[in-house]
């Protein structure tokens, strides 16, 4: 049996604006993972996909072309020049909440690629894996930025500009993030589509907002590289203010953001598409427990603490 794993991710700075060519920063979250297992099956069975979390089992040959799991299997086998006439069982599971901004779709696809590579004793570098997953991300998100597949495939903090070479950068001083789940699903495709339509109606205003968010991402990278945690917090708060102006926050997010700030967080913002999903809080060792408690009291469905280093 071959097994592939992939971690989740959060965006620190730059969501939505990254779709329009501005920079964004994202980091892996190793506390949550997707897993894919590939096993040989009985002769003549073909390729069977078992999606445990969705409680679905189906044949690859019967899946529609826009099925994301089918798409990543087909594109991976084509990339490594293996025919589809295989007898395999692919089992997928994940601890990453769906539609919460943690990159669940990209992580599942990445885990599948890695499992298939191991099963067939093939190798692809992180860039090639990222490129394969990006094509599947179009099914999940419509017009993805490419940041999810990049940070998850490379498993490093990344500074990302769409269409340009991704940069892995140095974290001068490890920092703690508390990630809190609103419990509200927020499909990226919907929020990204709404922002695009608003941009089409008011291009000048939205380009200015995207510019401001891009500047924050640039300043955020400098703060991380210099180990200036306090500056990071201020920039996160400003990024959240701009995301409100993009109309991608929500009452559930604002409730958790307020609770985290009350608990002593240095900075707070939504992470991902918004309209639900997750928020992140920058904390110290001293404030981590209190912020986590405040978030739970405010109704967070789940709270994760991760160190970025």
Description of each model-found segment:
Residues 276:
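Glycine-rich phosphate-binding loops that contact phosphosugars or nucleotide phosphates
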Residues 30:
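Gly/Ser-rich catalytic/binding loops embedded in alpha/beta enzyme cores
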Residues 77-98, 132:
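Glycine- and acidic-rich phosphate- and metal-coordinating loops
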Residues 102-122:
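DPxDG-like acidic metal-binding loop motif
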